[in-house]
Amino acid sequence: MKNLRIWSLLCLIWMGVLAASAQDTGKEKISLGDAMPAITLNSEIYGKVTPADLKGKVVLVSLFATWCGPCQIELAEVQKTLWPKYKDNKDFKLLVIGREHTDAELKKYNERKKFSFPLYPDPKR
């Protein structure tokens, strides 16, 4: 009986590994050092950001979620140290992107956090 449980557990784990490795999101994988993919961000609050807006600029991209603890620490640090130093630099662009969040959700979130940098939605991730 004990051997049957062990084999059953191993089979379940193996099936999970196979299922996870078989998933293909159809999205191109990005590696460190690759060029940034051409993205367009649309915000009812902050407007549209296109690849042309980013050309020739240093771009810092921060992907976050409102429920993510480490993200909250990172964004607070960006607000405190990085944003005041670079916000007026025409060659710098900060893209803080709320994954799976809408403009309305980000607006409500920012009413609490009081960040002075733009938050762009990515509701469809």
Language model regions located:
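A short beta-strand-turn-helix
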Residues: 38-59
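Acidic helix N-cap motif at the loop->helix transition within catalytic regions
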Residues: 104-107
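Short, internal strand/loop/helix patches
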Residues: 110-125
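N-proximal helix/coil linker or "cap" segments that precede and/or mark the start of modular domains
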Residues: 18-38
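Bacterial N-terminal signal peptides
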Residues: 8-17
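Positively charged n-region of N-terminal signal peptides that target proteins for export
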Residues: 1-6
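Conserved helix-turn-beta segment immediately C-terminal to the redox Cys motif
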Residues: 57-58, 73-97, 111
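Short pre-active-site segment immediately N-terminal to redox-active cysteine/selenocysteine motifs
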Residues: 57-59, 64-67
